[in-house]
Amino acid sequence: LVQKSDQIARRRGRPRGFDTGEVLGAATERFRTRGYAGTSLDDLVDATGLQRPSLYAAFGDKRALYLATLDRTIERAGRGFDQLIAADLPIRQSLQAMFRTIVDGYLTGETGPSGCIMVSTSATSAVDDAEIRARLAAFLKMEDDRIEELLVARGDPAARAHARVATAVIHSLSVRARAGAPRAELEALAADCVALIAG
């Protein structure tokens, strides 16, 4: 939902007609694991299977590729929330499904649990990069708005406040996953949030 793994098998010498989504997925995984500053162009060549000239031609420089991965993450997360809202499950089951997908995604990564690319990497770069900051703000607003929409549709009278609590827990789960928290700890925190909101 918010961060499902984009891991793919690495391929070298990818043909000219490469799949843009697949390449962005591979780049997302590398950035998610190593962060923006910690990811080199050689890392991206290794992850995507594209050589530097092809990467530059398709996406521009490293920063432009990073921004494209953030845009893709926002779009994919929004789509996941839309599907959850459309499923029309009761409030408790909706929240349980949301957190289950989130925890599953956060526990994936190239070298171990990597959390959410937005929370784990863009928050650092947002301080001095206006475009990254704008994307992070858009992501946070999208999360707040979609979870509020979900809760309003289920009749929650405190939907706005509860949505912000849920978003805060989602971000905490990302940090805890990167810190090595076991699945049981993440699931317990998610269950506490569900109980707080759904009663």
Please place each PLM-identified region on the residue numbering.
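Short helix-capping/turn signature of helix-turn-helix
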Residues: F59, S120-D128
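N-terminal intrinsically disordered/low-complexity leader segments
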Residues: L1-F18
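Amphipathic alpha-helical packing segments from all-alpha helical-bundle domains
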Residues: G78, Q93-R100, D128-R154, A161-R164, ...
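Hydrophobic alpha-helical segments that form the core
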Residues: K4, T101, S114-A123, A158-R176, ...
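Short, basic, alpha-helical segments at the C-terminal edge of helix-turn-helix-like DNA-binding modules
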Residues: D71-A77
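Hydrophobic alpha-helical connector segments
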Residues: A68, D82-S114, A163-A166
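Amphipathic C-terminal alpha-helical segment
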Residues: G105, V127-D128, E149, T167-E185, ...
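Helix-turn-helix
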Residues: E22, A26, R30-A64, A68
